[in-house]
Amino acid sequence: PLRVALVDRILHDPTNVPYLQGEEKFDPRVSALTTASINLFSDLGVWESITGMRCCSYQAMEVWDAEGTGQIHFSAEDIKQPSLGTIVENSIVNTALYSLLNNIENLELLAPLEIEDLSTIQYGDDFRAKLTTKDGRELTTTLVVAADGTNSRIRSLAQFKTREWDYEHQALVTTVRTELPHEHRALQRFIDTGPLAFLPLLPAADSEDERYCSIVWSLVPERSREMLEMTAQQFKIELALNLEHKLGNIEAIEQRFVFPLRQRHATDYFRGNIVLMGDAAHTIHPLAGQGVNLGLLDAATLSGELARGVQAGRNIADPIVLGRYQRKRIGHNLGMMWLMEGFKHLFAEQTLPVRWLRNMGMSGLDNISVIKNHLARRAMGLD
């Protein structure tokens, strides 16, 4: 088997996982996992661990336009699936995945360890990558897989070219407790200031308390600053008002956080023996919660192509092997990115003709079940 070193800037500390600190403590960063991602975690043997901690499946999604009558409703029942997806706190996913590492004999975890420099060296007839850490350690490897996030140090050191732009919006995230139960529904309202999403949560694996939601609100910086400066009571009132009281009043909120929104895509996913995946390769607007799912599909595709290459007797950094990964993923990722970009611009436009067409289009699509259900299945990774 291949020898693998997992280098992480931060050593995962399970004592910092909000889930372990009480039922009413939540991680502000959550992911909406699709069926394809859930299947991957099941294959890895960690899905049972995730569900044993806590997560919340959702059977319906309601989307509507604040500036008119346009709305669309997606239902798991309509596409004959048990759910549309599952909301999971990122720290719970990390905890489950880290628990796997002890069972992998050919893997060594190097953390906390930060990469300072990257170079290519001659190794017989081949070339290898040499990583230098901040503490002066040197690591030599046949292939570097950069999965180090949106501000990837490896991508920068390897001088990958990217296309990127700032959305001039920020995402405000927090966790709230609502007056009315979410009933396992995800809610998304498009407002002139930016989309507001309520994603359902459960405080424990066996809980029936459906009054917790993770919120993601896309706002211009000035507006997000106003929201952060509000008192808890003011913010609760503002939030309930902007969701049109679909879940009644907001009864409690946790700490609010803000992070910038930026779209970025690497023009190539590999250079020499460096390969990018996940947010290091592409950063997408959180409009539909697809970022983590795209990254997981990257990981599944890359591991499949590496295994295929090894079976064929190829070097794992062979351009043929990495090229197959790039061809399979770059088009799919770009397609999803442009779809989200189109949605963003469509709902940002507030002129009367566009608003009228937008509302007509949403309501019309809601009545065409074949197209609507195909979109739902595609978003879930089923088609």
Functional labels for PLM-detected ranges:
Residues R223-A317:
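FAD/FMN-dependent oxidoreductases across multiple families
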Residues G22-A66:
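N-terminal FAD cofactor-binding segment of flavoenzymes
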Residues T34-I38, N90-N94, Y98, H169, ...:
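A general structural signal for well-ordered alpha-helical segments in protein cores
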Residues L6-V7, A146, M277, I284:
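Generic enzyme active-site microenvironment
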Residues G304-D383:
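C-terminal helical "tail/cap" subdomain of flavin- and related membrane-associated enzymes
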Residues P1-R29:
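Glycine-rich FAD pyrophosphate-binding loop
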Residues I50-L157, W165-Q170:
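Conserved N-terminal helical subregion
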Residues F41, K130, R137-E138, L143-N249, ...:
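Conserved FAD-binding catalytic core of PHBH/FMO-like flavoproteins
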